[in-house]
Regions:
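An N-terminal hydrophobic leader/cap segment in hydrolases
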Residues: 1-31
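Short beta-strand element of the alpha/beta-hydrolase
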Residues: 50-58
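Conserved alpha/beta-hydrolase
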Residues: 72-94
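Alpha/beta-hydrolase active-site loop
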Residues: 98-119
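Hydrolase active-site cap/lid region
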Residues: 139-195, 204
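Short alpha-helix in the alpha/beta-hydrolase fold that links the catalytic acid
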Residues: 202, 211, 225-234
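Short beta-strand/loop motif that positions the catalytic acidic residue
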Residues: 208-210, 215-217, 221
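Catalytic histidine-centered segment of alpha/beta-hydrolase-like enzymes
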Residues: 248-258, 262
Length: 274
Protein backbone atom coordinates (compact mmCIF):
# COMPACT_ATOMS: atom_id res chain seq x y z
CA UNK A 1 0.00 0.00 0.00
CA UNK A 2 2.91 2.36 0.72
CA UNK A 3 4.44 1.57 -2.67
CA UNK A 4 1.09 2.27 -4.33
CA UNK A 5 0.63 5.47 -2.35
CA UNK A 6 3.97 7.01 -3.26
CA UNK A 7 3.77 5.98 -6.95
CA UNK A 8 0.21 7.16 -7.54
CA UNK A 9 0.13 10.19 -9.81
CA UNK A 10 -2.73 12.61 -9.22
CA UNK A 11 -3.64 13.94 -12.65
CA UNK A 12 -4.43 17.63 -12.19
CA UNK A 13 -5.75 20.28 -14.55
CA UNK A 14 -3.81 23.24 -15.88
CA UNK A 15 -4.08 26.34 -13.71
CA UNK A 16 -2.76 28.87 -16.24
CA UNK A 17 -2.14 29.24 -19.96
CA UNK A 18 0.57 31.13 -21.87
CA UNK A 19 -2.09 33.17 -23.67
CA UNK A 20 -2.99 34.77 -20.34
CA UNK A 21 0.48 36.34 -20.39
CA UNK A 22 0.33 37.27 -24.10
CA UNK A 23 2.99 34.69 -24.88
CA UNK A 24 3.49 33.09 -28.28
CA UNK A 25 3.38 29.33 -27.78
CA UNK A 26 3.03 26.01 -29.54
CA UNK A 27 1.26 22.89 -28.30
CA UNK A 28 3.83 20.12 -28.58
CA UNK A 29 4.06 16.36 -28.21
CA UNK A 30 7.12 14.17 -27.86
CA UNK A 31 8.26 10.85 -26.40
CA UNK A 32 10.44 10.02 -23.42
CA UNK A 33 13.82 8.64 -24.39
CA UNK A 34 13.51 4.81 -24.52
CA UNK A 35 9.67 4.75 -24.32
CA UNK A 36 6.56 5.32 -26.45
CA UNK A 37 4.43 7.33 -24.00
CA UNK A 38 3.17 10.63 -25.36
CA UNK A 39 4.21 13.68 -23.35
CA UNK A 40 2.46 16.98 -23.99
CA UNK A 41 3.48 20.53 -23.31
CA UNK A 42 3.97 24.11 -24.46
CA UNK A 43 6.97 25.51 -26.27
CA UNK A 44 7.50 29.26 -25.88
CA UNK A 45 9.87 30.30 -28.69
CA UNK A 46 12.03 33.41 -28.76
CA UNK A 47 14.87 32.55 -31.14
CA UNK A 48 16.56 29.27 -32.06
CA UNK A 49 19.89 30.86 -31.19
CA UNK A 50 18.73 31.80 -27.68
CA UNK A 51 19.27 29.51 -24.69
CA UNK A 52 16.35 27.18 -23.94
CA UNK A 53 15.12 26.17 -20.49
CA UNK A 54 13.15 23.02 -19.76
CA UNK A 55 10.78 23.30 -16.78
CA UNK A 56 10.25 20.03 -14.85
CA UNK A 57 7.38 20.07 -12.33
CA UNK A 58 6.92 18.02 -9.17
CA UNK A 59 4.71 15.08 -8.24
CA UNK A 60 1.00 15.88 -8.30
CA UNK A 61 1.59 19.12 -10.17
CA UNK A 62 1.32 20.04 -13.86
CA UNK A 63 3.32 22.10 -16.33
CA UNK A 64 1.48 25.27 -15.25
CA UNK A 65 1.61 24.59 -11.51
CA UNK A 66 3.45 26.68 -8.91
CA UNK A 67 3.23 29.83 -11.04
CA UNK A 68 5.39 28.21 -13.72
CA UNK A 69 3.79 30.10 -16.62
CA UNK A 70 4.39 33.44 -14.92
CA UNK A 71 8.01 32.48 -14.27
CA UNK A 72 8.35 31.34 -17.88
CA UNK A 73 6.97 34.67 -19.10
CA UNK A 74 9.57 36.54 -17.05
CA UNK A 75 12.34 34.41 -18.54
CA UNK A 76 11.01 34.82 -22.08
CA UNK A 77 11.34 38.57 -21.49
CA UNK A 78 15.01 37.88 -20.79
CA UNK A 79 15.48 36.13 -24.14
CA UNK A 80 15.11 32.48 -23.11
CA UNK A 81 13.07 29.94 -25.05
CA UNK A 82 11.06 27.83 -22.58
CA UNK A 83 9.60 24.32 -22.79
CA UNK A 84 6.99 23.40 -20.18
CA UNK A 85 5.53 19.89 -20.26
CA UNK A 86 3.55 17.43 -18.18
CA UNK A 87 5.52 14.51 -16.81
CA UNK A 88 4.13 11.00 -17.29
CA UNK A 89 0.95 10.39 -15.33
CA UNK A 90 0.36 14.12 -14.92
CA UNK A 91 -1.71 16.73 -16.74
CA UNK A 92 -2.43 15.66 -20.31
CA UNK A 93 0.54 13.32 -20.74
CA UNK A 94 0.22 9.54 -20.96
CA UNK A 95 1.05 7.17 -18.10
CA UNK A 96 -0.39 6.51 -14.66
CA UNK A 97 2.53 6.24 -12.24
CA UNK A 98 5.06 8.54 -10.61
CA UNK A 99 8.50 7.25 -9.68
CA UNK A 100 10.26 10.00 -7.76
CA UNK A 101 12.35 10.89 -10.79
CA UNK A 102 13.46 7.35 -11.67
CA UNK A 103 11.50 7.11 -14.94
CA UNK A 104 10.77 10.83 -15.15
CA UNK A 105 14.44 11.39 -16.03
CA UNK A 106 13.60 9.71 -19.36
CA UNK A 107 10.83 12.28 -19.82
CA UNK A 108 13.41 15.04 -19.35
CA UNK A 109 15.79 13.32 -21.77
CA UNK A 110 12.91 13.10 -24.25
CA UNK A 111 12.34 16.84 -23.87
CA UNK A 112 16.01 17.41 -24.65
CA UNK A 113 15.74 15.17 -27.72
CA UNK A 114 12.70 17.16 -28.88
CA UNK A 115 14.61 20.44 -28.65
CA UNK A 116 17.55 18.97 -30.51
CA UNK A 117 15.18 18.00 -33.33
CA UNK A 118 14.07 21.64 -33.48
CA UNK A 119 17.66 22.67 -34.06
CA UNK A 120 18.43 24.02 -30.58
CA UNK A 121 22.15 23.95 -29.74
CA UNK A 122 22.66 21.11 -27.24
CA UNK A 123 25.08 23.22 -25.21
CA UNK A 124 22.47 25.95 -24.77
CA UNK A 125 19.82 23.82 -23.06
CA UNK A 126 19.28 24.20 -19.31
CA UNK A 127 17.05 22.37 -16.84
CA UNK A 128 15.07 23.88 -14.00
CA UNK A 129 13.34 21.32 -11.79
CA UNK A 130 10.94 21.62 -8.88
CA UNK A 131 10.67 19.01 -6.08
CA UNK A 132 10.48 15.60 -7.82
CA UNK A 133 11.28 17.44 -11.04
CA UNK A 134 14.52 18.58 -9.43
CA UNK A 135 15.46 14.94 -8.85
CA UNK A 136 14.54 14.04 -12.43
CA UNK A 137 16.58 16.97 -13.75
CA UNK A 138 19.71 16.01 -11.83
CA UNK A 139 19.41 12.35 -12.83
CA UNK A 140 18.84 13.30 -16.47
CA UNK A 141 21.83 15.65 -16.51
CA UNK A 142 24.01 12.86 -15.11
CA UNK A 143 22.92 10.71 -18.07
CA UNK A 144 23.28 13.44 -20.72
CA UNK A 145 26.80 14.95 -20.98
CA UNK A 146 25.62 17.69 -23.35
CA UNK A 147 23.71 19.40 -20.52
CA UNK A 148 25.81 21.88 -18.55
CA UNK A 149 23.29 23.92 -16.57
CA UNK A 150 20.78 22.79 -13.91
CA UNK A 151 18.81 24.79 -11.35
CA UNK A 152 16.78 22.93 -8.72
CA UNK A 153 14.08 24.20 -6.38
CA UNK A 154 13.07 22.17 -3.29
CA UNK A 155 15.23 19.17 -4.23
CA UNK A 156 15.61 16.06 -2.11
CA UNK A 157 19.02 14.46 -1.59
CA UNK A 158 18.08 10.80 -1.11
CA UNK A 159 14.67 9.29 -1.80
CA UNK A 160 15.04 6.71 0.96
CA UNK A 161 15.18 9.52 3.52
CA UNK A 162 11.83 10.86 2.35
CA UNK A 163 9.89 7.65 1.71
CA UNK A 164 8.44 7.51 5.23
CA UNK A 165 7.49 11.20 5.17
CA UNK A 166 5.85 10.94 1.73
CA UNK A 167 4.17 7.64 2.60
CA UNK A 168 2.63 9.19 5.71
CA UNK A 169 1.27 11.98 3.52
CA UNK A 170 -0.01 9.71 0.73
CA UNK A 171 -1.35 6.77 2.79
CA UNK A 172 -3.52 6.35 5.91
CA UNK A 173 -0.57 5.05 7.98
CA UNK A 174 0.75 7.29 10.79
CA UNK A 175 4.24 8.71 10.33
CA UNK A 176 5.73 6.66 13.19
CA UNK A 177 4.62 3.40 11.58
CA UNK A 178 5.67 3.88 7.96
CA UNK A 179 9.46 3.42 8.48
CA UNK A 180 8.81 -0.20 9.53
CA UNK A 181 7.46 -0.97 6.06
CA UNK A 182 10.16 0.79 4.04
CA UNK A 183 12.43 -2.22 3.31
CA UNK A 184 9.50 -4.26 2.00
CA UNK A 185 8.19 -1.26 0.07
CA UNK A 186 11.56 -0.88 -1.64
CA UNK A 187 11.40 -4.51 -2.76
CA UNK A 188 7.83 -4.08 -4.00
CA UNK A 189 8.72 -0.89 -5.87
CA UNK A 190 11.52 -2.77 -7.62
CA UNK A 191 9.58 -5.98 -8.25
CA UNK A 192 6.23 -4.55 -9.34
CA UNK A 193 7.03 -1.09 -10.69
CA UNK A 194 10.68 -1.50 -11.74
CA UNK A 195 11.74 1.45 -9.57
CA UNK A 196 15.14 1.16 -7.92
CA UNK A 197 14.69 3.47 -4.95
CA UNK A 198 18.30 2.92 -3.95
CA UNK A 199 19.40 4.73 -7.11
CA UNK A 200 17.23 7.79 -6.41
CA UNK A 201 20.04 9.72 -4.78
CA UNK A 202 20.36 13.18 -6.36
CA UNK A 203 23.20 14.14 -4.01
CA UNK A 204 25.22 11.28 -5.53
CA UNK A 205 24.17 12.05 -9.10
CA UNK A 206 24.93 15.77 -8.76
CA UNK A 207 28.48 14.91 -7.72
CA UNK A 208 28.96 13.42 -11.20
CA UNK A 209 28.18 16.73 -12.93
CA UNK A 210 31.23 18.68 -14.05
CA UNK A 211 29.55 22.08 -13.72
CA UNK A 212 28.15 24.14 -10.81
CA UNK A 213 24.42 24.08 -10.13
CA UNK A 214 21.95 26.51 -8.57
CA UNK A 215 20.07 25.13 -5.56
CA UNK A 216 17.02 26.98 -4.17
CA UNK A 217 15.17 25.96 -1.01
CA UNK A 218 12.73 27.44 1.47
CA UNK A 219 13.76 27.00 5.10
CA UNK A 220 10.10 26.51 6.09
CA UNK A 221 9.66 23.61 3.63
CA UNK A 222 7.61 20.97 5.48
CA UNK A 223 7.64 18.43 2.66
CA UNK A 224 11.33 18.32 1.74
CA UNK A 225 13.42 19.75 4.59
CA UNK A 226 15.89 22.42 3.52
CA UNK A 227 18.75 20.26 4.80
CA UNK A 228 18.07 17.95 1.85
CA UNK A 229 18.75 20.81 -0.56
CA UNK A 230 21.87 21.73 1.40
CA UNK A 231 23.18 18.19 0.92
CA UNK A 232 22.63 18.48 -2.83
CA UNK A 233 24.51 21.78 -2.88
CA UNK A 234 27.35 20.40 -0.75
CA UNK A 235 27.77 17.44 -3.12
CA UNK A 236 27.78 19.59 -6.26
CA UNK A 237 30.82 20.99 -8.02
CA UNK A 238 32.70 23.86 -6.44
CA UNK A 239 31.12 27.15 -7.41
CA UNK A 240 27.56 25.89 -6.97
CA UNK A 241 25.20 28.35 -5.28
CA UNK A 242 22.76 27.58 -2.46
CA UNK A 243 19.98 30.15 -1.99
CA UNK A 244 18.03 29.59 1.23
CA UNK A 245 14.86 31.63 1.82
CA UNK A 246 13.63 32.10 5.40
CA UNK A 247 9.94 31.46 6.12
CA UNK A 248 9.34 30.06 2.63
CA UNK A 249 7.59 26.73 2.07
CA UNK A 250 7.81 23.96 -0.51
CA UNK A 251 8.30 25.31 -4.05
CA UNK A 252 7.13 28.74 -2.87
CA UNK A 253 10.33 30.69 -3.49
CA UNK A 254 9.19 32.31 -6.75
CA UNK A 255 5.81 33.11 -5.21
CA UNK A 256 7.42 34.84 -2.23
CA UNK A 257 10.42 36.50 -3.90
CA UNK A 258 9.56 36.72 -7.63
CA UNK A 259 11.93 39.50 -8.67
CA UNK A 260 14.99 38.15 -6.88
CA UNK A 261 14.12 34.64 -8.07
CA UNK A 262 14.09 35.73 -11.71
CA UNK A 263 17.38 37.58 -11.30
CA UNK A 264 19.17 34.64 -9.67
CA UNK A 265 17.84 32.08 -12.15
CA UNK A 266 18.49 34.19 -15.24
CA UNK A 267 21.98 35.19 -14.10
CA UNK A 268 22.88 31.56 -13.51
CA UNK A 269 21.66 30.43 -16.93
CA UNK A 270 23.13 33.48 -18.66
CA UNK A 271 26.54 32.57 -17.28
CA UNK A 272 26.22 28.90 -18.19
CA UNK A 273 24.48 29.09 -21.58
CA UNK A 274 25.40 32.35 -23.32
Amino acid sequence: MIAQGVTKANRGSQVANPSEFDLEFENVEFFPRYEDLVLRGWYLPVDLKSPTLIFVHGIGSVRSGNNAVELASRLVERDFNVLLFDLRGHGSSDGDKASGGYFERWDVLGAIDYLLELGIDSHRIGLIGFSMGASASILAAADEPRINAVAVDSAFADASDLIAREAARATPFPSWLTPLFIPASNLIAKGIYGIDIGSLVPERAVSQLDFPVLVIHGIADQRVPWEQGQRVSDAAKEGSVMWLLPEVGHVDSFLEQPDEYVVKVSEYFDERLR
